[in-house]
């Protein structure tokens, strides 16, 4: 069941990336991110309030948000900072790079998570899982090389560096999620970390963007900004429940979630008219084969 949830989360993440790319086209990055945190928190705020003031309504359901103290909230605040750091780097990078380049670089996260999971949680992979992991790593590497044909110098492009930092902090977030899910309710973590991100973003907007807003790309409203929040919240909700299963493996869940690159690739080809699709499509077939071996290895 947890593997099915991981694949569902991957599909939702692909839509999230596509809506994010559209929202950031010729738009100010920080306001888009700020609105995303607001809409995401508004989605979960009713569940927080109902659980606190009318506890019997959601009691025992997957939408219940347990009432906890500071000793728990401090761990969720840490997650908020980690995730927001990854998002800031990722949003700036995605604005300036093709979606079919960003996807493969983001797909290196499972490699980092795999190493971390083996070191921190003692996870061990069977033969099928190792085959799946190696195929996925190879395919992501080849897909990244295809991007060089578009004239993007990976060594000297600061936006590439931003995406790499987003992948690194995203991997740290994934490992931290596995730690949190061993002891905390998934709905508790997802609800409150979205709320805390709004408060973290307020000073960032006021100090970094607002004073210089007339000197940079102006902000424009786009309805796809709401789509970012909807697909992200749905993807994360499914993801947290996948990790809450006792036998779930963060290294596999993280790898499967990166198959969202397939969905974002389709959007990049059909809606954003990106280049070098033939060579990238061949690489994507390896991604799918790798995901199939991961599926075999978990049964």
Which positions does each model-derived feature cover?
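Juxtamembrane helix-start motifs in multi-pass secondary transporters
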Residues: 32-33, 102, 189
């Amino acid at each position: 069941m947890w593997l099915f949830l991981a694949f569902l989360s991957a599909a939702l993440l692909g839509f999230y990336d596509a809506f994010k790319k559209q929202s950031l086209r010729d738009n100010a990055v920080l306001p888009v991110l700020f609105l995303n945190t607001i809409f995401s928190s508004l989605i979960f705020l009713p569940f927080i309030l109902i659980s606190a003031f009318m506890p019997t309504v959601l009691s025992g359901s997957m939408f219940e948000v347990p009432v906890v103290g500071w000793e728990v909230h401090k761990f969720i605040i840490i997650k908020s900072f980690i995730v927001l750091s990854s998002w800031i780097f990722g949003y700036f990078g995605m604005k300036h790079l093709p979606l079919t380049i960003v996807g493969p670089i983001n797909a290196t996260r499972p490699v980092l998570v795999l190493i971390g999971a083996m070191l921190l949680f003692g996870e061990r992979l069977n033969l099928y899982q190792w085959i799946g992991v190696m195929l996925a790593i190879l395919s992501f590497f080849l897909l990244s090389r295809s991007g060089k044909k578009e004239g993007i110098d990976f060594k000297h492009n600061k936006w590439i560096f931003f995406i790499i930092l987003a992948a690194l902090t995203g991997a740290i977030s994934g490992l931290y999620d596995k730690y949190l899910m061993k002891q905390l309710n998934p709905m508790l973590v997802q609800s409150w970390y979205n709320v805390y991100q709004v408060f973290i973003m307020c000073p960032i907007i006021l100090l970094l963007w607002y004073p210089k807003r007339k000197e940079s790309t102006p902000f424009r409203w786009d309805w796809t900004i709401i789509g970012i929040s909807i697909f992200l919240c749905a993807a994360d909700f499914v993801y947290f429940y996948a990790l809450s299963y006792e036998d779930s493996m963060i290294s596999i869940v993280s790898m499967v979630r990166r198959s969202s690159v397939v969905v974002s690739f389709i959007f990049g080809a059909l809606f954003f008219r990106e280049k070098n699709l033939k060579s990238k499509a061949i690489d994507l077939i390896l991604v799918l084969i790798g995901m199939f071996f991961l599926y075999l290895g978990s049964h």
